[in-house]
Amino acid sequence: MLVFGKDQNGNDVKNERQQQGVNFGPRIKCPYTDVRLIAIFHEDDRDYAKYLLHYFKHGDYGFKNGNYRITDDSQRKKLSQYIGTNVEYAEKELHIEFKDRQNPVKEVKEALEGEAYQNLDTNVKYVGIYVSPFHKYASEREQKKCYYQIKEMFLQHKIPTQCIDSDKMKAQQKRDVEKARRDFIYTLQNMGVAICAKLGGSPWLLDEAKKEELIIGIGAFKSDDRQYIGAAFSFDNTGVFNNYSYFQKSELDELVGAIKMAILNYSSVNSKPDRLIIHYYKKISRKNEFQKLEDMLHELSLNIPVYIVTINKTESEDIVLFDENSTYNTRYNVAKSLMPYSGKWINLGRTREGYRYLLCNNTRYENETFKATDGFPFPIKLTIACPNRNGEIETAVVQQLIDQVYQFSRIYWKSVKQQGLPVTIKYPEMIAEIMPHFESKTVYTDRSSLWFL
């Protein structure tokens, strides 16, 4: 179960589905009271950028949308609703309109070096809304480079950015007008959730009693034949994100040192953790990697179990599960899906690295309606080991660790959709993908901000 904001009676809102719960506001509001939006756009996209900012502030397009009419405020999905604080437009001189569609970096850089940006109001938190001529997955190397350069330049001014592909945005807005619909609202909903996290808020959390344990995720992304490791430091068991660090593959000592700092920082606010849980993107070397970690724990006089949960990024297709009673409704009848309930798992037996398990991670929840449009993902493989303890891991502990992987797949704050992998793997991978494109390793001072979403 997930927990969101408050209802009209001041009670916590709990829901299985992110898309429904976010309408009650964030679990933890962004800490700023004055948030202002800066538009960054090509001159041909001026009107679309204007409509986009209007939608963020007012919850509607700002122009006649076919036969569609907003009849009451409950239908408006303003950005303020998702971040928990008021939103205004930035000062006129801060908006940036560029002419070079293929390489806007020079114009954006000149604007950021101008007087307006050198004298920003320190009492205001600015967010850049970048209507990009191309997206970060662009095939052209130079286009991709531009995307990341602009993101880094704004971060140097402590301004997180939310990007949207210009062509996709225009196509969706056009369809909405032609069909008198508001489907673009779902894109805005995802963007609102991401902006909340970029501003240090938590759109939703896990409905779990807080435990004295530390969860650290280590993931990787390979770019240009070099492998980078990004480590998301760290989470508590409710999903609260605390910190992150970034390393190259060869910097194992730095990685262990960062885990040490995460433990010390955690212990300075809470009691010492009762256990350390590491979600790892690959099999861990007992001799080369875990030994350094064990030595560090000994140095801290911390005699706690360390559970290594290896999470295979590739969905399992050689071994799958079926549920004969699993169905879903089509337009005409009831069809079999064969997909087990989300969170179900089975034991695949023991290997040299530990015990292997198969976890179903989808959107079929008990006592909830399943939508075929959510897809039918294959389960994922996990391996669980506790290298610094002898004997088998208790079944109850295994259940807790597997359920934690499943639950951490539900606090992905870039979308209201359930993910196949936990954020302990996805977030580090995202950091590792972005950082090689940045000139500086240190680009943002607020470590509680998920600026990379």
Over which residues does each language-model region extend?
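Long, contiguous domain-sized segments
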Residues: 71, 78, 93-104, 109-123, ...
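Aromatic-residue detector
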Residues: 13-23, 27-31, 43-45, 60, ...
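Long, charge-dense tracts
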Residues: 9, 18-145
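Flexible inter-domain linker/hinge segments
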Residues: 1-31, 178-205
